[in-house]
């Protein structure tokens, strides 16, 4: 996980979390319940463990059915969530005024200062790696990032088109301008802006309204709604439109609780995604209710049901 907040660059590596040889590490760290909570169908924990262990011993296999794909994407949500939690725990400010660090101080002060990761200040998330880059639909990549990272406020969701960022990093050491151009025009694929209010409200109440330039939408608490790039004024990808986003009284999208924000938005390949599920994201403990919600959110993103 790489991040830049307030001009401070941080990098962490969670080498034990992956989707091939180390997929069972994700299973061990998160458990079957946490993986199963992202599935739009009920699954026996024993069957889930068997499927993931088969993936571990045959790491080059790809999902053969839509159900297999949904299971793999559920595991990826947990891998991303755990890696991000690890990153937040290490990306912290130092205690006091001490700035010089040696190895010992890094471990002593790892839990000392506040985390540098402020999701409300984040402008863009770039998802890279096999599961995100090679998902059959970009909306699947966007939903995985929304579930795992829980972006707050207004955030542009993007993916690495064909998992080329590591190669561009090497290329940039010798041909910086060429690498930058490829990065901007061929690597980064914009899924669209995600609008996610922070806070909790009663289910069924209107959480957020979006208006301006031919768009008028109201989204209730617990719902996801997508304004497609081809609808209304969003006729072309990469085209910006100025919209006003107004959260309900107890919710915040960056300007304060209940305060509206007016800015330019970009639809991207998915559209403008309004995520009114609340932050932090709380899923129902009832299995049937949770499965129903997952199916509802898949449909809202324009994705097929299993």
Residue ranges and their predicted role:
Residues 2-306:
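Helical "lid/coupling" subdomains associated with nucleotide-phosphate turnover
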């Amino acid at each position: 996980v790489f991040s830049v907040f307030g001009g401070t660059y941080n990098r962490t590596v969670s080498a034990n979390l992956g989707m091939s040889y180390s997929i069972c590490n994700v299973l061990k760290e998160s458990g079957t319940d946490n993986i199963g909570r992202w599935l739009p169908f009920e699954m026996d924990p024993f069957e889930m463990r068997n499927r993931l262990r088969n993936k571990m011993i045959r790491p080059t296999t790809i999902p053969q059915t839509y159900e297999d794909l949904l299971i793999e994407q559920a595991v990826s949500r947990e891998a991303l969530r755990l890696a991000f939690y690890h990153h937040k725990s290490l990306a912290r400010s130092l205690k006091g005024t001490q700035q010089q660090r040696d190895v010992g101080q890094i471990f002593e002060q790892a839990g000392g200062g506040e985390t540098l990761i402020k999701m409300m200040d984040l402008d863009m998330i770039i998802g890279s790696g096999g599961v995100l880059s090679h998902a059959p639909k970009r909306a699947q990549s966007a939903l995985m990032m929304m579930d795992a990272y829980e972006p707050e406020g207004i955030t542009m969701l993007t993916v690495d088109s064909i998992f080329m960022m590591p190669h561009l990093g090497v290329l940039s050491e010798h041909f910086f301008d060429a690498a930058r151009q490829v990065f901007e025009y061929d690597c980064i694929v914009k899924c669209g802006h995600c609008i996610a209010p922070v806070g909790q409200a009663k289910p069924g109440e209107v959480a957020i309204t979006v208006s301006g330039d031919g768009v008028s939408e109201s989204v209730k608490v617990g719902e996801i709604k997508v304004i497609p790039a081809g609808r209304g004024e969003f006729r072309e990808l990469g085209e910006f439109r100025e919209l006003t986003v107004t959260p309900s009284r107890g919710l915040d999208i960056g300007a304060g609780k209940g305060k509206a924000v007016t800015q330019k938005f970009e639809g991207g390949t998915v559209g403008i995604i309004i995520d009114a599920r609340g932050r932090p994201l709380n899923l129902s403990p009832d299995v049937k209710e949770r499965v129903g919600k997952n199916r509802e959110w898949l449909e809202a993103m324009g994705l097929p049901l299993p």
